[in-house]
């Protein structure tokens, strides 16, 4: 506030200096204003400034940032305005002296045509004006002084405008602080609140004032200047400004039949068509004068200075509210004017049944806006129900404001329709752009994720499964089953007694290492190299067949026929054994072994197939090597028994 005071004080001092420095020879046009205007302007400024300070002191929560922003905006706008005017004045001044010198030359073209000669005169007169005005520094200084005076006067006018910092409370408990000047209407303030609160702009929104002393509430009309009624509040007032929805604000235009056809049945009024409503509005609001609802009925009137209420028969007229002291007579000579609507407003009252012992809680009052406390000039009325109270209050508003009320309603409808259309466009754009994409992607991902893993797992299992089935077929015959489980490193090794379990799991382990050779007997052979007793290992001709070897290994007993071969000496030199193994197949008769293991048993001694390659590759089964010696001896004994048997 100190900065603002200093700014305006400097401005006034500058004006004083400028007015003193002006000479009497200056043109009367710019100098005529300063002598007559400065004194009243200074007084007006001081009054407006005092009101401004009072408004800041009255309100506790004032938004100084918004206040300074508005002041700076107003000052900058006026400065820009006068800067542009100064530029235009400078541009237009040189044209004036040019025609003064060659008057005879330029008089004719000017008379012929206004547009063409203007361009020619400007082009020809451009050179002469500079010398005429360049030397006239005094005139330029005078012009600058005049511009400064105009700018100062404009700023004074802006400062003279009453401005109030208003705290508006909203229904959700929040509040907004606004700076309002006397030129703004309630409609302008509501538009500002719509932008700040982002609420829907329906026609029911209202700016209301509440008076806790009188327990009253009134919705400001959209065309009213908000500063005017607020400036009547006292310094210590507890009045509040609210921003809330009031359904009865424009109910007369939504359902005019309720107010103009109130004597008819209420049920029939609700079913009126829209065309009939529009016609009713045209008849009452679009004519030369507005027709006020013809309301009449019994109301309770509070006596002055007492808490007693008397029934009176009231009639509503365009000029005011009348009642009949003699029953229900309607003769004009018998009517008494209770109040005229020119200088009063209508207010809703709250809890008057407790405060003034009213017959009901549906009360309203008529009073001057400057009356802020109880007074004998306030007229209190009480109705039987809420419907009749809204009927009378709305009728009084129509009688007071006339067509202006209808114009306010149409402006509110335009504002609401515009905001609604814009909101619908934004909602449609956002919904169409965002909704379709996520669902199909999620479904596709969920659908494909489970399928590929299942397919991958199935083929892998199938590749490992082919060897097991033959092993399952040969599992029952092997007698040395208890000894065979230890060799496989699989977890099923501990359960030695269950032959089927061990065989199935053993089959799973051998297949992976045997893939390179496709012969399963080598795994037992891997165990055979470490033990010295296996002399029959050379007899592995039956291992040449891929299917039987896995079965033999699983059974243990049938796999023994191939290892028993006598050439044990071939084990130390495994490399040469590879070559010999390749040539060994022809001498023995291996073809019969695929169908049955018997032929393979008959020819093991004759065919010495050194399957040394598998042992080096088979490193995992080394853990079972120590037990492999005894196992192989038992296998050899079993094979010998089988050989002896015809």
Swiss-Prot record:
All copies of domain Ras-associating, residue ranges: 162-248
Localization in the cell: Cell membrane; Cytoplasm, Cytoskeleton
Ranges for region Disordered: 82-141, 420-646
Record-level GO cellular component terms: cytoskeleton; cytosol; plasma membrane
Domain PH stretches: 292-401
Segments of skewed composition (Low complexity): 429-445
Domain of life: Eukaryota
SMART domains: PH, RA
Pfam hit, one: RA_2
Keywords from the named record: Cell membrane, Cytoplasm, Cytoskeleton, Membrane
Alphabetized InterPro entries for the sequence: GRB/APBB1IP, PH-like_dom_sf, PH_APBB1IP, PH_domain, RA_dom, Ubiquitin-like_domsf
Biased composition (Polar residues): 101-116
Disulfide bonds: none
Membrane disposition: Peripheral membrane protein
GO BP of this protein: signal transduction
Start-end of Pro residues biased regions: 465-500, 509-536, 560-577, 584-598
Family of this protein: Belongs to the MRL family.
Functional description taken from the UniProt entry: Appears to function in the signal transduction from Ras activation to actin cytoskeletal remodeling.
PANTHER family assigned: AMYLOID BETA A4 PRECURSOR PROTEIN-BINDING FAMILY B MEMBER 1-INTERACTING PROTEIN (PTHR11243:SF14), GROWTH FACTOR RECEPTOR-BOUND PROTEIN (PTHR11243)
Name this polypeptide is given: Amyloid beta A4 precursor protein-binding family B member 1-interacting protein
Species: Danio rerio (Zebrafish)
């Amino acid at each position: 506030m100190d900065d603002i005071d200093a700014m305006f004080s400097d401005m006034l001092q500058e004006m004083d200096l400028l007015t003193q420095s002006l000479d009497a020879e200056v043109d009367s046009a710019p100098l005529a204003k300063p002598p007559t205007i400065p004194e009243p302007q200074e007084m007006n400024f001081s009054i407006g400034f005092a009101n401004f300070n009072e408004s800041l002191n009255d309100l506790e929560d004032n938004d100084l940032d918004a206040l300074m922003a508005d002041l700076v905006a107003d000052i900058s706008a006026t400065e820009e305005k006068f800067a542009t005017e100064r530029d235009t004045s400078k541009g237009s001044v040189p044209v004036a002296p040019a025609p003064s010198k060659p008057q005879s030359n330029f008089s004719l073209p000017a008379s012929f045509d206004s547009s063409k000669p203007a361009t020619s005169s400007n082009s020809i007169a451009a050179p002469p004006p500079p010398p005429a005005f360049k030397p006239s520094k005094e005139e330029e200084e005078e012009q600058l002084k005049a511009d400064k005076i105009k700018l100062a006067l404009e700023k004074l006018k802006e400062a003279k405008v009453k401005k109030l910092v208003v705290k508006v409370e909203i229904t959700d408990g929040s509040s907004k602080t606004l700076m309002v000047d006397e030129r703004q209407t309630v409609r302008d303030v509501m538009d500002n609140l719509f932008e700040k609160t982002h609420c829907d702009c329906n026609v029911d929104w209202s700016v209301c004032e509440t008076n806790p002393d009188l327990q009253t509430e009134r919705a400001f009309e959209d065309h009213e200047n908000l500063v005017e009624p607020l400036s009547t509040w006292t310094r210590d007032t507890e009045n509040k400004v609210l921003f809330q929805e009031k359904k009865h604000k424009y109910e007369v235009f939504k359902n005019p039949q309720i107010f103009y056809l109130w004597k008819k049945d209420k049920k029939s009024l609700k079913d009126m068509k829209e065309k009939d409503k529009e016609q009713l509005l045209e008849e009452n609001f679009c004519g030369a004068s507005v027709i006020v609802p013809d309301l009449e009925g019994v109301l309770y009137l509070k006596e002055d200075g007492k808490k007693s209420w008397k029934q009176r028969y009231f009639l509503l007229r365009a000029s005011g509210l009348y009642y009949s002291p003699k029953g229900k007579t309607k003769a004009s000579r018998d009517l008494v004017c209770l109040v005229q609507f020119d200088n009063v407003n209508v207010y809703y009252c709250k809890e008057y049944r407790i405060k003034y012992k009213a017959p009901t809680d549906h009360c309203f009052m008529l009073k001057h806006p400057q009356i802020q406390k109880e007074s004998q000039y306030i007229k209190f009325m009480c109705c039987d129900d809420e419907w009749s109270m809204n009927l009378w209050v709305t009728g009084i508003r129509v009688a007071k404001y006339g067509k202006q009320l209808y114009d306010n309603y149409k402006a509110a409808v335009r504002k609401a329709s515009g905001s609604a259309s814009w909101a619908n466009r934004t909602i449609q754009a956002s919904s169409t752009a965002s909704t379709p994409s996520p669902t199909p992607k999620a479904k596709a991902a969920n659908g494909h994720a489970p399928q590929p893993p299942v397919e991958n797992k199935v083929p892998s299992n199938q590749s490992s499964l082919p060897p097991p089935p033959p092993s399952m077929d040969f599992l029952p015959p092997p007698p040395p089953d208890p000894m065979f489980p230890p060799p496989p490193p699989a977890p099923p090794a501990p359960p030695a007694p269950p032959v089927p379990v061990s065989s199935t799991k053993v089959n799973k382990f051998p297949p992976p290492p045997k893939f390179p050779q496709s012969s399963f007997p080598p795994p037992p052979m891997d165990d055979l190299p470490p033990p010295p007793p296996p002399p029959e290992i050379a007899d592995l001709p039956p291992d040449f067949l891929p299917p039987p070897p896995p079965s033999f290994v699983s059974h243990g007993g049938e796999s023994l026929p191939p290892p028993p071969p006598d050439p044990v000496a071939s084990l130390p030199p495994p490399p040469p054994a590879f070559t010999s193994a390749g040539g060994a197949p022809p001498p023995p008769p291996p073809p019969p072994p695929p169908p049955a293991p018997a032929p393979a048993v008959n020819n093991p001694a004759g065919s010495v197939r050194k399957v040394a390659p598998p042992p080096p590759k088979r490193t995992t089964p080394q853990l079972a090597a120590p037990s492999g010696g005894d196992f192989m001896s038992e296998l050899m004994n079993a094979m010998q028994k089988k050989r002896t048997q015809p």
